[in-house]
A protein has these predicted regions:
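Short hydrophobic beta-strand element within catalytic cores of glycosyltransferases
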Residues: 567-570, 580
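Short alpha-helical donor nucleotide-sugar binding micro-motif in glycosyltransferases
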Residues: 529-530, 537-542
Length: 659
């Protein structure tokens, strides 16, 4: 076998990449598929003394049992003989328990259905040569009785084929042909051996891609036996470790990204070493680690398989299992670990952490629940769905909700970011109140007092006049955020307020919104996604902040507006209403929870905005109250204090409500 050279760093990355992707291979065979990788990981785990890899190999083997079918060819390369040979090998090496006559009975019967006399391909990988080798291995397998796995008629037909066929063109099979008759007559036994396998069948091409053509290369790696070249652990910091696990998504540019920043602030000067792990990252296809300002950042790549090609529940189950294997090189089982899961789809990750890190604590934050987004938080609709579980129109909502419940029950603590979220966790998900901690979001106070001259300068910078009255909204442009309602309400306001301008900040598709303001396009600015500095500048020159969401768990944008002293108008039925305390610190629009009521909702929004624009004293009063509310409830110091007390146990306070 040709020697292939690779540096250590590349080797680690190849193995990590393999862990993430092997479960999604459609080939379950020996040379390029799952069976070959089962053998690799079984040996690898034993060599580097990491049980996670041996368990991983066993779970891959279970997948082979699930996916094997009668439509597979019977050859050695990617068919039944190769899979059967692999199982004989695993039992022989002590990686797998059981009687191979029982395990392989169905495979042996399928192989006997094919008449060997009709084979024209005599090669080892795809033809008769491989079948002969498999039969030799099976006949040599230890057994307590004289009962053979193949009947006498089939064995006689193989004897005739070996004596009659011309194998001279297959030079690598010469010793196999000689030995076959001896094994058939009970005069010799042979054991499955990988090195012999590759002597018989030279690889068609040399590859260092363990995923596609890596069985030969993987075996060469293992034969070296040099653990330092094969395995790397990533030890870290203190005895107490806090792992915040997130998934890459567009929301990282918005709320989730802000949450990570507030977590970094909250963990400063704590006894825990903070690691932020981003899953399904586009930055790598394996695992990448870097450190910044005493925080370790780990990116774990996605898979070659796209989630839409298989059931999403199965996809996450397999992906998160792979993540658990990679985490074994990062998090020690005997350390004081807290795993904080930042996504409601992480049920299988939580399950794996429970099983493999029994001394650790698992926490999750409920940023949102899918059913609330789809139903706009309407409990009446949810009650209908729960009472009609077989209604096909809502089947997906029922399935996701049940998965969410299973996930939450696996967690030791569940963080609710709003009171209505707390209530939902108790009433809908059935969680005991003692398991839930209520910690509102908080952000760092970056408010800057500005003179009228400074504000005028910023207005000119963005193309506004000094006497313009600016309404501003920020968030992704989609129906849920109510931007179309704002555009329609604005179209009704412009005739009454000649200096009124509308600024919409955020990504998404503005087409629907633009159509509603086509006659006033010169007075509407779509600025797209902007950085925080520019966003806060825009807030500083605006007169009213408008967040007309039909549903929102607890919006960071509202906190940023209040921090900057903006009077805000928000939708009801969500955490936004809680932020303004039901109308004490901002105006609440009584929307109907129905996309079909857009005209009615736009009219209600128009009425509220018209009232606020006409009443200067109300705006000035809400400016002061908005800022006061932020300082007393949503400054980062509030979040940090309650997080340390209620989540990581500093001061041992265990209250579940905030004042």
């Amino acid at each position: 076998m040709k020697s292939i050279q690779m540096d250590n760093k590349s080797l680690f990355k190849e193995i990590e990449h393999l862990v993430l992707n092997v479960s999604f291979l459609t080939d379950i065979g020996l040379f390029h598929g799952k069976m070959g990788h089962v053998i690799f990981f079984a040996h690898y785990g034993r060599l580097v003394n990491n049980d996670f890899y041996e368990v991983f190999a066993s779970e891959l083997l279970d997948e082979i049992y699930e996916e094997i079918n009668t439509c597979l060819p019977i050859n050695m390369e990617y068919g039944l003989c190769g899979i059967g040979w692999g199982m004989e090998y695993l039992v022989g090496k002590g990686f797998m328990d059981g009687c191979t006559d029982e395990i392989l009975k169905d495979i042996d019967n399928l192989i006997m259905e094919r008449d060997p006399r009709r084979f024209h391909d005599l090669s080892f990988r795809k033809g008769l040569g491989g079948i002969l080798y498999y039969v030799m291995i099976r006949l040599s397998s230890p057994r307590e009785t004289d009962n053979l796995p193949f009947d006498s008629l089939y064995l006689q037909s193989l004897r005739e084929v070996v004596l009659e066929k011309d194998f001279s063109k297959e030079k690598s099979l010469s010793f196999l042909i000689d030995d076959f008759i001896l094994v058939l007559d009970g005069k010799k036994k042979i054991k499955p051996d990988l090195s012999v396998l590759f002597q018989i069948s030279l690889p068609e091409k040399s590859s260092t891609d363990l995923l596609q053509d890596g069985l030969e290369y993987g075996w060469q790696i293992l034969e070296s036996g040099d653990v330092d070249k094969l395995y790397k652990e990533y030890p870290w910091g203190k005895d107490r470790n806090y792992y915040l696990i997130n998934e890459e998504s567009e929301s990282a540019n918005y709320g989730i990204g802000t949450y990570l920043n507030q977590m970094i602030e909250a963990m400063k000067e704590s006894d825990y070493s903070l690691t932020i792990i981003t899953l399904r990252s586009s930055k790598t296809s394996s695992l990448v680690i870097e450190e910044k300002l005493n925080v370790r950042y780990i990116n774990i790549g996605s898979t070659r398989c796209k989630m839409n090609v298989m059931n999403w529940i199965k996809y996450f189950e397999r992906y998160y299992r792979s993540v658990i294997v990679l985490l074994s090189t990062i998090a020690a089982e005997n350390q004081n670990n807290i795993f904080h899961l930042n996504n409601m789809h992480m049920k299988d990750l939580a399950l794996g952490l429970k099983e493999n890190y029994p001394l650790s604590e698992i926490i999750c934050t409920v940023h949102y629940m899918d059913w609330k987004l789809q139903l706009l938080g309407d409990r009446r609709k949810l009650d209908y769905i729960l009472n009609h579980p077989n209604d096909r129109n809502f089947k997906s909502i029922s399935i996701v909700l049940e998965e969410n419940k299973k996930f939450l029950k696996l967690c030791d603590k569940v963080i609710a970011v709003s009171q209505h979220s707390f209530n939902t966790l108790v009433e809908v998900c059935g969680l005991p109140k003692s398991k839930i901690v209520f910690v509102r979001h908080g952000i760092k106070d970056e408010y800057k007092t500005m003179s009228q001259e400074e504000k005028g300068s910023i207005k000119r910078k963005y193309g506004f006049h000094s006497d313009d009255t600016i309404l501003i909204s920020a968030g992704r442009i989609e129906p849920l955020k109510g931007m179309d309602l704002l555009a329609e309400a604005f179209s009704s306001l412009v005739s009454e307020y000649p200096h009124l301008r509308l600024v919409i900040v955020g990504g998404g598709s503005p087409d629907v919104v633009q159509k509603k303001v086509i006659s006033y396009c010169g007075r509407v600015s779509f600025v797209g996604f902007v950085n925080k500095t520019d966003l806060y500048e825009l807030f500083s020159i605006s007169d009213v902040g408008v967040l007309p969401s039909l549903y929102e768990e607890l919006g960071y944008v509202a906190l940023e507006m209040m921090m900057n002293g903006l009077p805000i108008v928000v939708g009801n039925h969500s955490g936004l209403e809680e932020i303004v305390d039901g109308g004490k610190y901002g105006l609440v629009v009584p929307f109907e929870q129905d996309y079909g009521k857009s005209k009615e909702n736009a009219a209600i929004l128009y009425t509220v905005l018209d009232h606020l624009l006409k009443d200067n004293s109300l705006r000035e009063n809400l400016q002061k109250k908005s800022r006061e509310r932020f300082i007393s409830c949503f400054d980062i110091s509030c979040f940090t204090r309650f997080f340390k007390e209620r989540v990581i146990g500093i001061n041992n306070e265990k209250t579940n409500t905030l004042s």
